[in-house]
Swiss-Prot record:
GO molecular function: ATP binding; ATP hydrolysis activity; ATP-dependent DNA damage sensor activity; mismatched DNA binding
Function: This protein is involved in the repair of mismatches in DNA. It is required for dam-dependent methyl-directed DNA mismatch repair. May act as a 'molecular matchmaker', a protein that promotes the formation of a stable complex between two or more DNA-binding proteins in an ATP-dependent manner without itself being part of a final effector complex.
Family classification: Belongs to the DNA mismatch repair MutL/HexB family.
Taxonomic lineage of the native organism: Bacteria, Pseudomonadati, Verrucomicrobiota, Verrucomicrobiia, Verrucomicrobiales
Stored PROSITE patterns: DNA_MISMATCH_REPAIR_1
Source domain of life: Bacteria
Keywords: DNA damage, DNA repair
Biased composition (Low complexity): 366-391
Region spans: Disordered: 338-407
Protein known as: DNA mismatch repair protein MutL
A Pfam family it matches: MutL_C
Example of a GO biological process term: mismatch repair
Amino acid sequence: MPSIHVMSPTLASQVAAGEVVERPASVVKELVENSLDAGAKFVRVEIRRGGVGMIKVTDDGSGMSRADAELCTKRHATSKLSSLEELFEITHLGFRGEALPSIASVSRFKLCTRQQQDLEGWEIRIDGGLEHEPRSSGVSPGTAIEVADLFYNTPARRKFLKSAETEASHVEHQIRLHALAYPQVRFAYKRDDQLVFDLPATADLRVRISALTDAATAAALIPIETTIGPGISITGFLLPLSEARRTRKGQYVFMNTRPVEDQLINRAIRDGYGGFPTGLHPALFLYMEVEPALVDVNVHPAKKEVRFRRSADVVNTIVEAIANTLQKHARQEIHAAAAPEPERTLPPAHSTTAPYGEIPARSTNPGSAFPAAARPAPASSAAQPPLSSSAKQSHGAVPPPTLRAIPLKQVPATQGKLDFHRQEDEETARNAHENAALERDASAGFSYLGTLRQQFALFETPEGLVLMHPKAARERIIFERLRARREAPMPSQQLLDPVVLDLDPRDFAVIRQFAPHFDQAGMAVTPFGQNTIRIESIPALLELENARAFLLELVDRLTQSEFSRNAKRVAYETFIGEFARKSAWRERISPHRAPAILKDLLACEVPYCTPGGKPTLVNYSVPEIKRKFGLQA
């Protein structure tokens, strides 16, 4: 008897589902793509229990006949391909004919559909691959697909799913991607019978982006200069450096209305920005139209990655579009800086358009918004003022933002304040004693020589010369002292008027999951509605305008780490790292403190760099110095 056998159709579909149906968001992706391919103008998505309990996608598209409805659940059945040549000129989102049978094999599946010209519709039911007899149904024109009890017959797959909160955040992110790709389509999303959003169709991409982002992001949008290359055109919006993230959560890239994640495109984006800080990723909304014959979308199971036939043309066009846009925007800011700043007035307290006042937008100063390589040199060394109101409004009005905040009034005193700044007389006495001890300790091997430009401390060692940056050293010292007393609460400042922020659903899920750990780290954060949080206190020394950026950086660090085990440590160390940096760099350090600081630094667990990775000590060996003078080492 042969050991090789042909899998049953049901088993084959369940195996294929491993690639097609990774999580509830994968189901939503496939179903919404089918709706869009059917020409829908309104797509409604409903989920329960993160999508595991139920997913329902309803559209007003073309619908299907009974024959097509029965065939669409068969493997490799599709209306979008009839020859190999068509594969290389595909314009549809889906084309393999694997999604519906794979989904139906691991769930309780129901499809109701009706064509506009038909008097009645049809209902198809499949339970874990077991098909029921089709029956007529009185439904509206279009298609409605309901997927219940996802992975009920493959419990091993269900174990790999995250919490309902996390899975729901991925579902919402997937819907947002399609809503950004198709602003001309109305999208509605309900979660556990609660309406999350209902986005009306619009011809203005900025309106759709503004509806799905917070006010700070919407106000900072920079239109990309439409750029046309060989077989490709680029448009969209850029965001300044202040909106950069440690992950690519802020990057939305679409190719022929298809959300894509491609390393080639990522490199082109970085090259376009030029001089971008290591470890950060620029935020943008990039829309590419590429001739179908010049791109292969059949290279990834989920069709997230693509392969370009003329990749150099794609890279050059993206780089040109981004670089030209940044340069033009920088010139506009420099020009606006020459004009007098218009007088600004605050809206009255009873205003109906902004009842609580808007959170101030981030600075768009060209000195802070973009890398130096992406903007022309200023005419003088004077700081450039922010972009004027008239320049900001040159691209059309932005609809009322969803991000609101009550004006901040900080409590003057901080809670749990730690005093790292010693009185000068105490420092003098202690340093004199420690300096003498350091000089008597021959094993220390460091002889203090003095300072360089009142900024660096110089020490002679048996191996050569050591330069220490006292403030960077103090940053490391303060960080490790705070880390050693982790049980103590982080110094914080209470906000009389809490700040309310709207967030990306994935960021909101992380914050909601680990909010208790934030308290010890000095930031009290509580959920405040769908994808909205309220900040009630922030770490001492943290300015309010940096609270959002600081919170998102913490989310990125939690996402990058194994936060299921280390969330408390990551949250605490992120906050104390920021506290140590601000505390150290605000200190006034006199030169005679250098030896004592060095001694404290060398007692640290990691003395050679700050928590952020910047060096605290730089060593020049004697052989290296001799080589500089042309002497034999």
